């Protein structure tokens, strides 16, 4: 009886294994609908101030961006428009502000002395990135005086 059951299950196990292996094919993954549905932007973003590798000694740093081909809008919406949005400013990967202007004073009081990465990203009016992303980044060295 046991031999009969095993001889019946072996072909089923083989079919199951073949089906599992077929599901693990080498097809290229498709982009997710979310990433392919993001609006495109032809805008470019650069950091005007501070300059790359600047040494900052004050506890407040003026950050100034230049945005070309895009428009800063002070609204949030799910009706996405290419090249309209605002700037997310981060230091060392930590979001500092969602900025609706091209310049702002940033407090450095909570940061340790040493090198830091400043990044600005021009994002759509729903706070999500464009596709491709519009990013500017630079390194500055924070050396507080006193």
What residue spans do the PLM features occupy?
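Short acidic/polar inter-strand loop motif in beta-rich domains
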Residues: 123-133
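Bacterial signal peptide processing site
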Residues: 25-27
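Short, compositionally biased P/S/T/A/G/V-rich stretches that sit at domain boundaries
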Residues: 29-58, 146
């Amino acid at each position: 009886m046991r031999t009969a059951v095993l001889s019946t299950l072996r072909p089923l196990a083989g079919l199951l294994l073949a089906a599992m292996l077929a599901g693990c094919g080498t097809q290229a993954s498709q982009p997710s609908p979310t990433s392919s549905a993001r609006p495109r932007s032809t805008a470019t973003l650069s950091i005007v101030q501070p300059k790359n590798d600047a040494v900052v000694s004050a506890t407040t740093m003026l950050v100034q961006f230049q945005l070309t081909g895009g428009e800063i809008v002070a609204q949030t919406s799910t009706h996405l428009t290419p090249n309209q949005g605002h700037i997310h400013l981060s230091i060392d990967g930590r979001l500092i502000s969602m900025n609706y202007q091209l310049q702002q004073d940033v407090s450095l009081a909570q940061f340790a002395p040493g090198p830091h990465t400043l990044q600005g990203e021009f994002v759509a009016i729903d706070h999500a990135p464009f596709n491709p992303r519009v990013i500017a980044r630079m390194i500055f060295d924070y050396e507080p005086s006193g």
